[in-house]
Structure formats: structure tokens, C-alpha cells
């Protein structure tokens, strides 16, 4: 089954070209089926790139997905055209009376700030509380996951002395988890962050279960059944060249930056990077969508009750 996207959204042509099944809302309305309603609260500066990354993973599942783009109500983005935001995004205050089968809260390049110093923190707290009554399952990604685990459990993020940057080996520490169905025991995940979560502090928080972890990069994926949520601190959704773009940007700006670890062949930035995480990215998000499908009520109004 396809993902439903407006025909004018850039992701529509991108995913169609890649062979992902995409359909317009008009065509979807003629099908006698209830699609899963998945929201993307997009906090990243490069909105279109992030839309494409998550739509690609969500759209690869065998279920029809109604993909809704959501923004913070008052925050004004500086890196995406206002026309794009107006055409495709809805402010949270407009959707907060609606029900969603799933919600993804993305990362944001604001790790250096205390949570309370983020300009939209109060509304984001409202969003996170709202998920408990209006969303069947929520997926917090990188800073979004750190914000959620702090909001619900007061587990703090910690500043790193050097940026965790590259593709790091991770272990499957919960092979019986339905979210890890089909996962290998050992695999790589892109990492790009200045902060970390600490395993001992996660272990001390009641109700949390670590599913993926790395000796080098620390805890990665945490399940929070009590809040119907997953928190991932790394970036399965990244394109093959996302780390390259970040590295090239910092080099061009004269910022100190290490070559991303285990990313380029022979750690040589002149060589094209290899994508070694794509299959596990599709597994994780496909398993998440399947778990939503198995658990969400047929009547959306029953979500959260």
C-alpha cells in the first residue's frame, strides 16, 4: 500500500522516481480502507530533506499512510520558503483536537541549549502531553527523543567534549522486541550529535527498556511502553550523503570537525560514502508501523482512551 502525499510536495516526485508507492489524497479517498494517520513534527532546518527522509521510510511499508506535516505554531523557520510551509504544514494548535495513529518528533540543531531555553519548549511540552491522549505511538528522534525522555522521566542529556560523528557499530540487546524483528545482531547507524544520554541514568528510570546500544556511541533506541513511545538518539533516516553534507559544510565554514568515523571507504573523504544502514532503517520503521497497525483502534476517536 502507498503513502498519501500532495502531488505538489517535493517528496511526491522524489519517492515516485525511487519506486516508492505514492498516491494523491484524491485517489486515496476512493479506496475503501482506513489509512494510518502518521504526523511528522518537523523541527529540522532543512524541512524538505527531512520530509523526504521520513516519507521514504514510512512509504515503504505495505499499508496506506496518510502523512501529515506539522510545525510549531509560532516558530518561524529561516531555511525553508514560507510558501512551502504555508502549502504543506499545519500548526500544532490547528491539529491538536485531532487523533493520530503515529507521530514522529524530529531532531533539531539546538543541543547546546537547555530545554527550558528553547523558544518553543512550552508548546513542545504541550505536544508531548497531547500524545498521551491523541496519538497511538510516538517516535522521538535524536533531540526529539532526548526532549521526550527528559519530559517524561527527567533523564538529562549531557554535553560531549567532541562531537559523536560517523557510523558506529551497534548491538541488538533486545532481539525478541517486535520493533527489532529481522534485525542483525550487529550493524552500523549514523550518529551526529554533541550530546549523549547515559545508560546508567536510563536504567535508573522506571519503565524504560534499551533496545539498541553501542560501546562507542552509548544507548541508541529506548522503548517507553508506559507512554507508548520510542526514543532514538541516532539517525537511521539519514541519506547516504547526509554526513558528507555536514562535514563539507563545516570544512567550508572553517569549523573544527573530524572526518566522520567509519563512513568513507578507508576514511578518505575523496571517496563516495557507502550506505550500510538502509536495510535496518526500513526494518525499524516498518516494524514500528506494523506495531501501530496491530494496536491502534479502528475508530480513531478511541485512540488514547
UniProtKB/Swiss-Prot annotation:
Protein's name according to its UniProt entry: Homoserine O-acetyltransferase
UniProt gene name: metAA
Site for Important for substrate specificity, residues: 192
GO terms for MF: homoserine O-acetyltransferase activity; homoserine O-succinyltransferase activity
Catalyzed reaction equations: L-homoserine + acetyl-CoA = O-acetyl-L-homoserine + CoA
Annotated source species: Cereibacter sphaeroides (strain ATCC 17023 / DSM 158 / JCM 6121 / CCUG 31486 / LMG 2827 / NBRC 12203 / NCIMB 8253 / ATH 2.4.1.)
The enzyme's E.C. designation: 2.3.1.31
Pfam family, one: HTS
Family: Belongs to the MetA family.
Amino acid at each position: 500500500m502507498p503513502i498519501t502525499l500532495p502531488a505538489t510536495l517535493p517528496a511526491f516526485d522524489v519517492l515516485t522516481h525511487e519506486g516508492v508507492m505514492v498516491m494523491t489524497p484524491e485517489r486515496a479517498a476512493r479506496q475503501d480502507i482506513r489509512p494510518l494517520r502518521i504526523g511528522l513534527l518537523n523541527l529540522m532546518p532543512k524541512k524538505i530533506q527531512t520530509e523526504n527522509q521520513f516519507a521514504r521510510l514510512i512509504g515503504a511499508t505495505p499499508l496506506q499512510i496518510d502523512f501529515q506535516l506539522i510545525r510549531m505554531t509560532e516558530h518561524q523557520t529561516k531555511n525553508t520558503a514560507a510558501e512551502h510551509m504555508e502549502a504543506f504544514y499545519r500548526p500544532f494548535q490547528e491539529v491538536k483536537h485531532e487523533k493520530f495513529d503515529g507521530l514522529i518528533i524530529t531532531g533539531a540543531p539546538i543541543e547546546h541549549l537547555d530545554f527550558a531555553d528553547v523558544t518553543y519548549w512550552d508548546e513542545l511540552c504541550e505536544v508531548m502531553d497531547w500524545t498521551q491522549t491523541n496519538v497511538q505511538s510516538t517516535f522521538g528522534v535524536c533531540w526529539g527523543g532526548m526532549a521526550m525522555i527528559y519530559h517524561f522521566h527527567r533523564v538529562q542529556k549531557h554535553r560531549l567534549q567532541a562531537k559523536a560523528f560517523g557510523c558506529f557499530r551497534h548491538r541488538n540487546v533486545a532481539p525478541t522486541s517486535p520493533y527489532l524483528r529481522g534485525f542483525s545482531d550487529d550493524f552500523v547507524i549514523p550518529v551526529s550529535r554533541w550530546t549523549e544520554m547515559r545508560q546508567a541514568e536510563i536504567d535508573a528510570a522506571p519503565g524504560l527498556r534499551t533496545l539498541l546500544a553501542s560501546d562507542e556511541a552509548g544507548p541508541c533506541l529506548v522503548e517507553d511502553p508506559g507512554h507508548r513511545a520510542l526514543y532514538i538518539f541516532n539517525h537511521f533516516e539519514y541519506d547516504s550523503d547526509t554526513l558528507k553534507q555536514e562535514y563539507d559544510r563545516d570544512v567550508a565554514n572553517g569549523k573544527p570537525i573530524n572526518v566522520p568515523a567509519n563512513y568513507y571507504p578507508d576514511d578518505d573523504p575523496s571517496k563516495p560514502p557507502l550506505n550500510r544502514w538502509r536495510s535496518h532503517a526500513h526494518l525499524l520503521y516498518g516494524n514500528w508501523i506494523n506495531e501501530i497497525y496491530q494496536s491502534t483502534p479502528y475508530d480513531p476517536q478511541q485512540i488514547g482512551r
